């Protein structure tokens, strides 16, 4: 029999449904409280009702659940220590957008070898989010795939739409449905307007097609997300300086949007040199001390060990070191959190 469709599909595997996975790894009442209260705290911070600083910090991507839980345990201590000045949320990214090719994240390829055991990856990711939240550490992630959010979104306190997808209509529609506050990164070329446009688009009602928790394709009608915001991540040059922030605030003001934003210390702002996150942090701390109220949050790439490593066949990985973008090590991360907490004192 002749075919005109699926001519380039070489394999189709059955996928666990979000409902089945949620029954296997159940959210508890205490974790629900953590997620709900953190989302509310973030909303209050980004609208100026809470003078604290939101800090999204953690590895570029999660590849080792054991190391991630250890990191979360250390982070919980600092979250408690600085709770009056910082709202610390752990970066737990399971999906990786690639400019061309490369490892696409723990959910897609949990074994790091191209075997693509997605069902196992989804299970590992959901269990890990439960373990992290159980420690009292809320979780943040990037929403990249249009379906994967159904499996983990109930455990996420803050979400991001990345620089490569901020301009995408379907991602803006997805953001309009998400229950958590969502940050939109400026484009890889530094274009801030597309992030502002994304906030506007995601704030209103949409309809889109997607599977529900039971795998049935459905028409989703959304109410819009009132807590979209810009993430300044740099582009061809950094954009964390006061003059760059003023330009972004002008764009937000033009459309009567909330005049608060987040600064990504990594990516274009550190010129892809991970230790320069410390320099960005110094600048942001000074801007806060000098009275800037526009900066409501920051993002830091950090792990147990400094730097990054490549995945090489038959070679053991260094525990607690990133396999994607290089990160700050733990000591530098703790130093940076202390610096930010001290700067936020000026807001009280």
Swiss-Prot record:
Which GO molecular function entries does the Swiss-Prot or TrEMBL record give?
3-deoxy-7-phosphoheptulonate synthase activity
Name the Enzyme Commission number(s) assigned to this protein: 2.5.1.54
User: InterPro entries annotated for this entry?
Assistant: Aldolase_TIM, DAHP1/KDSA, DAHP_synth_1
Q: What are the annotated GO cellular component locations?
A: cytoplasm
Q: What class of enzyme is it?
A: transferase
User: To which pathway does this protein belong?
Assistant: Metabolic intermediate biosynthesis; chorismate biosynthesis; chorismate from D-erythrose 4-phosphate and phosphoenolpyruvate: step 1/7
Which parts form a coiled-coil structure per UniProt? none
Q: Pfam families under this entry?
A: DAHP_synth_1 (PF00793)
User: What is the catalytic activity of this protein?
Assistant: D-erythrose 4-phosphate + phosphoenolpyruvate + H2O = 7-phospho-2-dehydro-3-deoxy-D-arabino-heptonate + phosphate
> Which SUPFAM superfamilies does this entry report, sorted A to Z?
Aldolase
Its GO biological process annotations read: amino acid biosynthetic process; aromatic amino acid family biosynthetic process; chorismate biosynthetic process
Kindly state which keywords UniProt assigns to this record, in alphabetical order.
Amino-acid biosynthesis, Aromatic amino acid biosynthesis, Transferase
- Gene3D superfamilies referenced in this protein's UniProt entry, alphabetically: Aldolase class I
Purpose of the protein: Stereospecific condensation of phosphoenolpyruvate (PEP) and D-erythrose-4-phosphate (E4P) giving rise to 3-deoxy-D-arabino-heptulosonate-7-phosphate (DAHP).
Name the family: Belongs to the class-I DAHP synthase family.
- Protein name (database record): Phospho-2-dehydro-3-deoxyheptonate aldolase, Trp-sensitive
Q: Which organism is it from?
A: Buchnera aphidicola subsp. Baizongia pistaciae (strain Bp)
């Amino acid at each position: 029999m002749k075919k005109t469709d699926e001519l380039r599909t070489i394999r189709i595997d059955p996928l666990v449904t979000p409902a089945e996975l949620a029954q296997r790894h159940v959210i508890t009442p205490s974790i629900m409280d953590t997620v709900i209260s953190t989302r509310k705290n973030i909303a209050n911070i980004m609208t100026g009702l809470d003078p604290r600083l939101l800090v999204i910090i953690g590895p570029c991507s999660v590849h080792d659940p054991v190391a991630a839980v250890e990191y979360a345990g250390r982070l919980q201590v600092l979250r408690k220590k600085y709770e009056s000045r910082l709202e610390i949320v752990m970066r737990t990214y399971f999906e990786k957008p690639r400019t061309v090719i490369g490892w696409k994240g723990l959910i897609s390829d949990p074994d790091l070898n191209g075997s693509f055991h997605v069902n196992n990856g989804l299970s590992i990711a959901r269990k890990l989010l439960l373990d992290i939240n159980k420690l009292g550490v809320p979780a943040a992630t990037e929403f990249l795939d249009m379906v994967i959010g159904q499996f983990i979104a109930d455990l996420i306190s803050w979400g991001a739409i990345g620089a490569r997808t901020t301009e995408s209509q379907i991602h803006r529609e997805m953001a309009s449905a998400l229950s958590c506050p969502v940050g939109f990164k400026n484009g890889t070329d530094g274009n801030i307007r597309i992030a502002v446009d994304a906030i506007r688009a995601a704030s209103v009602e949409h309809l889109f097609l997607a599977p529900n928790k039971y795998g049935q394709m459905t028409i989703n009608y959304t109410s819009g997300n009132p807590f979209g915001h810009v993430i300044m991540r740099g582009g061809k040059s950094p954009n964390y300086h006061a003059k760059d922030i003023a330009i972004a605030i002008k764009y937000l003001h033009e459309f009567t949007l909330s005049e608060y934003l987040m600064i990504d210390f990594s990516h274009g702002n550190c010129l892809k040199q991970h230790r320069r996150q410390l320099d960005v942090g110094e600048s942001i701390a000074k801007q806060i001390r000098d009275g800037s109220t526009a900066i409501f949050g920051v993002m830091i790439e950090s792990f147990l060990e400094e730097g990054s490593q490549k995945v090489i066949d038959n070679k053991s990985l260094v525990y607690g070191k990133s396999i994607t973008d290089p990160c700050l090590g733990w000591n530098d991360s703790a130093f940076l959190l202390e610096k930010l907490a001290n700067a936020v004192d000026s807001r009280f």
